[in-house]
């Protein structure tokens, strides 16, 4: 298979979007260098690595240029978000398959090769996700179900126990590949034909659920989404965003959740979802106030709940959340 310039396609294009995560990014690239590029023999796959820097201010760009000259580095002037950043990289890519890889990941031996082989051997599969591990090698949840009112009303743990095939999780591990709704975007393999037929990641999400929405569209097009548990990747977990701005992150998650329902469910479900979320937050605020007085460590959590409830009550202003912070920095 040739690209538009008549050059044979590489087996895999690795796309990493990063934002102010210099140290973990350098570790991720070192793992690619150690596990993939240094490999020899018949099992070696041809790869390219594209790093899309979302306007970092921590020296990430300079460090990558200095230490990893083999990386195709795209230096963006601002934070475009996860989906748009990945799409910039995907548009640059030339691989038969693409891997969307978080900056806070570490590759383990054979993870890439086994997922590429699985895609090659199963043309009906459009997306593959490996098993994500914590740094201590314990398992992370890396499978998503499509958001629904059922999963909002019934606790996730109950659904996993009653319907393990429909709601798979690390609690009930699978040894063989299993078809799922969606896999986590921290490490997501997608075949080139999907990009051409379905399109790139939906850009109406700034952060959260963009890969879930994408998998929804990919499955609608007739492709399968599969979790391959024998392929394993370490995920340090939220190094670039979740630990830095917890309240903004939670606001952004709510915004993405409501957007998913507007796009893929009906208006009634969308309204019911928001009602459920508001009632839950109000309950957390009332009960959490007493707990916060008793345990000062919970005071920050209670303040975050108040702010998120306020965001709902004043009409969900666009200036709040991660995307709002990007707009505010751009206008300043």
Give the residues covered by each predicted segment.
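Short, well-formed alpha-helical segments that are part of the catalytic scaffolds
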Residues: 21-40
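A conserved acidic beta->alpha catalytic loop
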Residues: 31, 53-61, 78, 108
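Glycine-rich, basic loop-to-helix element that forms the pyrophosphate-binding segment
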Residues: 75-93, 114
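Short aromatic/hydrophobic "clamp" motif used to bind/position activated sugar donors
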Residues: 98
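Conserved donor NDP-sugar-binding/catalytic core segment of glycosyltransferases
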Residues: 106-142
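Short, flexible, basic/aromatic active-site loop/helix in glycosyltransferases
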Residues: 147-181
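A short, conserved alpha-helix in the catalytic core of glycosyltransferases
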Residues: 173-175, 179-232
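Non-catalytic, C-terminal membrane-associated alpha-helical segments of glycosyltransferases
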Residues: 248-256, 267-332
